[in-house]
Design a protein with these regions (language model features):
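N-terminal hydrophobic targeting/anchoring segments and the immediately downstream early-domain regions
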Residues: 1-176, 229, 233-351
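Loop-centered beta-sheet repeat module
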Residues: 178-214, 223-225
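Secondary-structure boundary/capping motif
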Residues: 191, 218-219, 245
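Short gly/pro-enriched beta-turn/loop segments at secondary-structure junctions
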Residues: 200, 216, 246-248
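A short alpha/beta connector and helix-capping loop motif
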Residues: 214-227, 307-312
Length: 351
């Protein structure tokens, strides 16, 4: 857990983002020949938003899905190289104390995560067993060991697709390649992630797969970037029963700033805060955090066209506006600190 020593090491309040796709942009820029992307572009932007800690995920884009291991290692190599080149402002961390030390040095701390694990079923020399294969479950640990040496602290079994581990939240109309929900392989991987102390993230899983994770792991889980389905009825958001279960297990729900998960008509800053209020009313403020999922630096369409400029939350520079509005809505400084970093550090300290 985050103890008083760790708390005392943090000089000021800061914001932790439970979900960032920055690694994707870093990889694309480096492929074009750019270097020190964090130092030149992202560190100043993150500081402007008060964000000093985040989970930086490796996400294999759909166009690379048939060669996931290769793309995953490209993303990992790009991220590690850029962090090394930008070491004056950013550092990979693996626990709460390391993050606190990094912040004290004036740097930004990155926890390494993976957004989807299709790569594990395609890993070289790893073929899914057709019959009893005692060596199979030992071989699948190889990619986890490779990532573990790089500092992996977080994992999602799938993105929106269905793979050989689980069903994604957007795979309901796709051809079924395995039975709906967690597969036996997915259950084994889930148990191994838990054994290694890696944060298991149920964002992007469909309801049946979330149920499977809950059956396999009787401990803390997170939903890094998901909202309340009751307020915005899309499959990517969480049902009330899953929100309650995450809270019961001591986890956190990171509220997502992606417009389509906030409201279908008015995805405003205040509606974002409504999701915070809704989840906090059900499981307590100690189990809510920020998982912004900002994509303004990627080639995406503008999704905030229905919101007035002062009601937008679409880039990291908008985070101070969110904090001010939380104060105006009646949140205390202690509550805002819990949302911003205290809850996340507590959970990461449990793993």
């Amino acid at each position: 857990m985050i103890d008083s020593t760790t708390s005392d090491m943090i000089p000021n309040s800061f914001v932790f983002d439970l979900h960032s796709d920055i690694a994707t942009d870093v990889s694309l820029r480096r492929a074009r020949g750019e270097r020190k992307v964090f130092q030149r572009i992202f560190c100043d932007r993150l500081r402007a938003g008060g964000v000093q800690g985040l989970i930086s995920v490796l996400w294999v884009e759909p166009q690379y899905r048939q060669r996931s291991p290769e793309r995953l290692l490209q993303l990992l190599g790009s991220l590690l190289s850029d962090v090394e080149e930008s070491s004056d402002c950013v550092q990979i961390v693996t626990d709460a104390k390391a993050l606190a030390n990094t912040i004290r040095q004036g740097k930004i701390g990155l926890f390494l995560g993976v957004e989807g694990m299709t790569f594990i079923e395609q890993w070289p020399l790893l073929e899914l067993p057709r019959e009893s294969d005692e060596g199979f479950y030992e071989r699948f640990r190889q990619p986890l060991s490779v990532l573990g040496k790089a500092g992996l602290r977080h994992a999602m079994l799938t993105w929106n697709e269905q793979n050989q581990l689980a069903s994604g939240s957007d795979s309901s109309n796709a051809p079924r390649v395995v039975a709906e929900g967690l597969t036996p392989f997915g259950r084994e991987v889930t148990r191994e992630l838990h054994r290694r102390g890696i944060a298991i993230d149920v964002s992007h899983l469909d309801d049946t797969s979330i149920d499977g994770v809950l059956e396999e792991v009787d401990g803390t889980i997170i939903a890094s970037h998901s909202n309340a389905r009751t307020l915005c009825e899309v499959p990517r958001n969480l049902s009330d029963r899953h929100i309650l279960e995450i809270g019961r297990r001591g986890g956190v729900v990171g509220i997502n700033a992606y417009a389509g998960f906030i409201d279908s008509v008015q995805p405003t800053l205040d509606r974002y805060i409504d999701h915070i209020v809704y989840v906090a009313e059900r499981i307590g403020i100690d189990h809510v955090a920020f998982g912004f999922d900002f994509t303004d630096y990627l080639e995406t369409q503008e999704l905030w066209h229905t919101a007035e400029p002062e009601q937008r939350l679409e880039r990291v520079e908008d985070v101070p506006r969110l904090l001010r509005r939380l104060t105006e809505r009646g949140f205390s400084k202690q509550e805002i600190d819990k949302l911003s970093y205290v809850n996340t550090l507590r959970v990461m300290g449990k793993l």
